[in-house]
């Protein structure tokens, strides 16, 4: 184990005629993932330079509480896991949920089908079944539920699950289609009941749902796959007068309800202003859900700060992010560290917004976004699919994406991309209940964040996107240590004080 033992000055206390000696040990571990090939490797040796970058950690300055990091249980990911050999299936689940793996603590799944399903489906397909007498989650029992159960068994500390619908069943909507349209007023109570039925059905399977988002991407997706549209006023009315009261009467008031669930920026602020307008509108909202697809580089700190100002006692949770394009190459780490990825906006964004969607480095986008979110009051961060195939599916709408783990089901092979290790730098070392703490970094290129876990360990994340190695010194109170970070790399530094008995 890599350790730097720093002895405090010995404190002499004269007690009962004798001398009591006390001192602190500072146990420091450094883990690095880099373009040069490190993958969460412990680092033992560092470069030295008289011109060090000072990073000061300020545990006395505290901010938001962290609830977790993780990915999503989609039908596509679950199907692939069940298609692989038992050995590879277990290997992937252990990599995400075990103590030796990434220790995912916050996850998401979908209510009814989504684009990352093998086909369209709902839990109630009988038109005008207002009391949902034919409600059934049998479709999820094929793949999603068995995978979640296995993950629960593997996870020592457990994990939270947020469930999101992409659409109500078409018979509840004004256009009778899986894509687009709105919920008909006469089915608002039925749709609210649908959520309660879902939560209780999953409870019967031994799976506890922690929270809900009201609707995935209520502004729509161009009617390319499952969706249902709301205005901020419509969603707020639905939560205030239907969903919230229904959950309450069903004994499910502990369920966290998150509004919005789309991209950051001006729209996020507009929705938050409606949701948290007064005590009545805000009553049943536990917070706001956000996505990252508004830009390939901008994490929109101003909008995140504004939402925190509007609702400082509510959650702000990043619920979806991914590289939204086909898997480029098989087992090629270099691509993930190269400025070669394009997102949807490269082609489809309006001309006045294309500047927000330049080509980007996948690892950089993940590291920058997670750190940027943490430094701007976000409580949790969830990736999209955990596993996809070599094309970026299966996806019934041909909306191919890239996941941290890629599976070749034909040859029964698995590829852990650099994205897996990038997320693990956060999920493995920043545990639920951690509190973000203050820091100061005297460098314009490094990105830094710091938290204090409930066991009093401090985790510092340092991201170096530059092509130059950086030598730095971390200072905390009267202690400090020197280290260095390679170009194009991420580090997690764990600081733990020990007080041995003497």
Where are these regions (language model features)?
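Bacterial Sec-dependent N-terminal signal peptides
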Residues: 1-24
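N-terminal catalytic cores of secreted or lumenal carbohydrate-active enzymes
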Residues: 36-209, 230-233, 241
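Conserved, mostly hydrophobic/aromatic
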Residues: 71, 103, 161, 212, ...
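Loop/turn elements at helix/coil->beta-strand transitions in domains of secreted/extracellular proteins
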Residues: 100-107, 156-160, 205-211, 251-256, ...
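Active-site neighborhood of glycoside hydrolase catalytic domains
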Residues: 190-208, 218-329
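Aromatic/acidic polysaccharide-binding cleft in carbohydrate-active enzymes
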Residues: 318-421, 438-441
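Carbohydrate-binding surface patches
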Residues: 428, 439-477, 488
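C-terminal beta-strand-rich structural cap/linker in extracellular carbohydrate-active enzymes
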Residues: 484-502
């Amino acid at each position: 184990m890599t350790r730097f033992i720093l002895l405090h000055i010995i404190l002499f206390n004269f007690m009962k005629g004798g001398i009591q000696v006390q001192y602190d040990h500072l146990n420091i571990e450094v883990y690095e993932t880099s373009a040069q090939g490190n993958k969460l490797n412990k680092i033992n040796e560092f470069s030295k330079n008289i011109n060090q970058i000072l990073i000061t950690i300020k545990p006395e300055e505290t901010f938001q509480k962290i609830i977790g990091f993780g990915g999503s249980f989609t039908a596509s990911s679950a199907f692939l896991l069940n298609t692989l050999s038992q050995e590879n299936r277990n290997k992937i689940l252990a990599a995400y949920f075990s103590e030796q793996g990434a220790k995912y603590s916050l996850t998401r799944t979908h209510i009814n089908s989504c684009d990352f399903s093998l086909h369209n489906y709902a839990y109630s397909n009988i038109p005008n079944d207002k009391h949902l007498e034919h409600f059934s989650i049998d479709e999820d029992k094929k793949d999603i539920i068995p995978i979640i159960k296995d993950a629960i068994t593997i996870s020592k500390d457990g994990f939270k699950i947020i469930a999101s619908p992409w659409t109500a069943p078409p018979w509840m909507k004004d256009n009778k289609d899986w894509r687009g349209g709105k919920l008909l007023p006469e089915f608002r109570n039925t749709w609210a009941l649908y959520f309660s039925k879902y939560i209780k059905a999953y409870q019967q399977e031994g799976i506890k749902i922690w929270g809900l988002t009201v609707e995935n991407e209520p502004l729509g997706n161009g009617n390319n796959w499952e969706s249902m549209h709301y205005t901020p006023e419509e969603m707020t009315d639905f939560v205030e007068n239907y969903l919230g009261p229904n959950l309450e009467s069903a004994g499910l008031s502990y369920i966290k309800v998150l509004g919005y669930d789309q991209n950051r920026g001006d729209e996020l602020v507009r929705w938050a202003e409606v949701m948290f307008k007064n005590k009545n509108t805000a009553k049943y909202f536990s917070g706001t859900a956000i996505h990252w697809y508004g830009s390939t580089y901008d994490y929109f700190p101003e909008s995140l700060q504004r939402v925190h100002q509007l609702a400082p006692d509510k959650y702000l949770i990043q619920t979806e992010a991914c590289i939204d394009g086909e898997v480029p190459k098989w087992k090629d780490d270099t691509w993930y560290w190269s400025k070669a990825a394009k997102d949807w906006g490269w082609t489809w964004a309006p001309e006045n917004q294309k500047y927000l969607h330049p080509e980007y480095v996948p690892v950089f986008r993940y590291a920058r976004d997670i750190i940027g979110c943490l430094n701007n009051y976000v409580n949790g961060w969830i990736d999209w699919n955990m596993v996809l195939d070599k094309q970026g599916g299966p996806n019934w709408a041909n909306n191919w994406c890239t996941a941290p783990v890629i599976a070749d089901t034909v040859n029964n092979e698995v590829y852990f991309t650099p994205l897996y290790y990038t997320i693990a730098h956060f999920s493995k070392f920043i545990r639920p209940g951690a509190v973000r703490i203050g820091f100061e970094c005297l460098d314009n290129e490094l990105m830094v964040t710091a938290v204090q876990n409930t066991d009093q360990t401090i985790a510092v994340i340092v991201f170096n996107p530059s092509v130059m190695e950086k030598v730095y010194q971390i200072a905390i109170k009267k202690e400090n240590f020197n280290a260095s970070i390679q170009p194009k790399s991420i580090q997690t530094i764990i600081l733990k004080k020990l007080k041995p008995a003497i």
